């Protein structure tokens, strides 16, 4: 049996990041943790491109454009959707996740989805550092995995 090994070497990988500006304090924390981890994995700052969007629902459209541009090896979606008093939380959470998955499946470009969906600010704040860094790990691993197939 041939086993494909995990490869977290980010050297020479080109990464696009789409950051939702809604709940910006959470998004900025995710971005910092993500970029710090990308650097630790060997991704050069010049190989990281950031685009911001108003909210999570707008992320898939920009991710699709980035994927279609053939300028990126992988993409990362960052942001936070925090439950409010209306059904809007479910719509935004579900549709942004579906849109991101659709882009990934239709283009073959790996996308790490770190748009947090939480019940409250405290839950989001508790996840910022870990989820931001995990997104970096996920995208680098998936890029390298796809290269081995």
Curated annotation (Swiss-Prot):
Q: InterPro entries from the xrefs?
A: LS, LS/RS, LS/RS_sf
Q: Which GO terms describe its cellular component?
A: cytosol; riboflavin synthase complex
Transcription regulation listed as a keyword: no
Query: Which residues are recorded as binding 5-amino-6-(D-ribitylamino)uracil?
Result: 22, 56-58, 80-82, 113
Q: Which residues bind (2S)-2-hydroxy-3-oxobutyl phosphate?
A: 85-86, 127
Catalytic residues identified in the record: 88
Enzyme nomenclature, EC number: 2.5.1.78
Q: So, what pathway does this thing act in?
A: Cofactor biosynthesis; riboflavin biosynthesis; riboflavin from 2-hydroxy-3-oxobutyl phosphate and 5-amino-6-(D-ribitylamino)uracil: step 1/2
Q: What class of enzyme is it?
A: transferase
Q: A Pfam family for this UniProt protein?
A: DMRL_synthase
**Enzymatic reactions:** (2S)-2-hydroxy-3-oxobutyl phosphate + 5-amino-6-(D-ribitylamino)uracil = 6,7-dimethyl-8-(1-D-ribityl)lumazine + phosphate + 2 H2O + H(+)
Arranged from A to Z, the UniProt key words for this protein are: Riboflavin biosynthesis, Transferase
One function term, GO molecular function aspect: 6,7-dimethyl-8-ribityllumazine synthase activity
Q: Which GO terms describe its biological process?
A: riboflavin biosynthetic process
Function of the protein: Catalyzes the formation of 6,7-dimethyl-8-ribityllumazine by condensation of 5-amino-6-(D-ribitylamino)uracil with 3,4-dihydroxy-2-butanone 4-phosphate. This is the penultimate step in the biosynthesis of riboflavin.
* Family in the record: Belongs to the DMRL synthase family.
Protein name, please? 6,7-dimethyl-8-ribityllumazine synthase
Q: Which organism is it from?
A: Methylobacillus flagellatus (strain ATCC 51484 / DSM 6875 / VKM B-1610 / KT)
């Amino acid at each position: 049996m041939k086993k494909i090994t995990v490869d977290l070497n980010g050297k020479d990988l080109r990464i696009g990041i789409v950051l939702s500006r809604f709940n910006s304090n959470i998004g900025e924390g995710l971005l910092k943790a993500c970029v710090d981890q990308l650097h630790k994995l060997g991704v050069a700052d010049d190989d990281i491109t950031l685009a911001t969007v108003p909210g999570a629902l707008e992320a898939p459209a920009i991710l699709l454009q980035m994927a279609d541009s053939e300028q990126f090896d992988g993409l990362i979606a960052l942001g936070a959707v925090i439950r409010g008093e209306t059904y809007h939380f479910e719509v935004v959470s579900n549709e942004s996740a579906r849109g991101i998955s659709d882009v990934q499946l239709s283009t073959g470009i790996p996308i790490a989805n770190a748009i947090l969906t939480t019940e409250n600010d405290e839950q989001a704040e508790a996840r910022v550092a870990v989820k931001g860094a995990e997104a970096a790990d996920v995208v680098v691993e998936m890029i390298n995995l796809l290269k081995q197939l």
